[in-house]
Each structure stands twice: as C-alpha cells, then as structure tokens.
Swiss-Prot record:
One of its GO terms (biological process) is killing of cells of another organism. Pfam families: Penaeidin. It comes from Penaeus vannamei. Residues 1-19 form the signal peptide. Belongs to the penaeidin family. This is Penaeidin-3g. The lineage of its organism: Eukaryota, Metazoa, Ecdysozoa, Arthropoda, Crustacea. InterPro entries: Penaeidin (IPR009226). GO terms for cellular component: cytoplasm.
Amino acid sequence: MRLVVCLVFLASFALVCQGQVYKGGYTRPIPRPPPFVRPLPGGPISPYNGCPVSCRGISFSQARSCCSRLGRCCHVGKGYSG
C-alpha cells in the first residue's frame, strides 16, 4: 500500500514539474514596462505614458500618436482633452 501511495505521489509530482496538469491556466508573459522616453522640448514628459504634459512644442505626429494610443488629444487653445 505504501508503495502505491509513493508511486502515485511521484507520478503526480512529475506531471506538475512537466506542466501537464495546469495546461488551461494563464500562459501569456508578463508585459514589460515601456522603455524610457527622452524628454522633448515643450514640457515635462508624463512618466507613465511618454506624452508631454502640455501640448506646446510637440510635433504633429507625436500629438496624433498620443491621441490614438491614449485618447489624450490636443486642441488648439485648449490643450489636452481626456
């Protein structure tokens, strides 16, 4: 009886070590934080999204990127919305 219990334990341990038991779980890798973005002229960079805090002095492509990725859109005379 002890031999059977020992063999069952070893077999289940081997399956866990090979990853056969938990096939349906969370398998995606943990995303890495975004790389450091150098500050651009026109205002400080927000540390969590890489978009300037103010709309002044940024290029059109950067403003469009911040708007499409984060919903932070620049409007003439109003600054960011969202």
